[in-house]
Amino acid sequence: MSETLLAGTAKAPSFDALTLALTRPAFLAELAEQAQIAGRSGNAFCLLLLDVDHLQNINDCHGVGAGDEVLVGLADRARRVIAEPAWHRSEYSLGRYDGGALMILARPCAASQAEMLAEALRFAVAEKPLGERISVTVSIGVAQLRIGESIDELLARTERVLHVAKQFGRDRVEVASTPPSRVARAKVVGLYD
């Protein structure tokens, strides 16, 4: 078999060379698999989208190498936070989204728990520099998968709330609202009949 043919059939790498997080395609494949599992089991999961605030300014002022250091530091800090005992009730996957953004899949996980995790991550990043004396902050969008929702819809909702966090001053967490399930609505309606 020729080298060209072998190169074409080789699997794409699963881990980002810089952050050692899952690559975007590998993370999205896991997200799709977990959505199918959640659809069968009813166990909720959440997606967190973390984006370094003003990364372009860091690259412009300190060089791309400094920006890379910040991303490596962000991935390491995220790993340390999710390894803390407070978060052991869930399993986590860390992936590289794009540019200065990382994704975390938390399963099983309610939106309220994901919001607390996001705040812990935000605080851990702001607490001390991520790299060579560069203090940074992150904005984080959080969304819980709605049963029957596509991965594209989940990603779009998570991106929207991340943009809201950026618009309202950065260094904050925003959570996408999740409408109550039909069962919860039926219980509430039953209370008022």
Q: Which role does the model predict for each range below?
A:
Residues M1-A12:
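Short, low-complexity N-terminal regulatory "tails/caps" that precede and couple sensory modules
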Residues D16, A21-C46, Q56-R80, G95-G99, ...:
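Conserved long alpha-helical elements within nucleotide-processing catalytic cores of c-di-GMP signaling
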Residues R80-H88, R122-R133, V164:
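Short catalytic/binding micro-motifs of nucleotide second-messenger systems
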Residues A86-R96:
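A short pre-motif secondary-structure segment
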Residues L94, S139-F168, R172-D193:
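Cyclic nucleotide signaling catalytic output domains
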Residues L105-R107, A143:
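Short hydrophobic/aromatic beta-strand micro-patches
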Residues I134-V138:
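PAS and PAS-like sensory/regulatory domains
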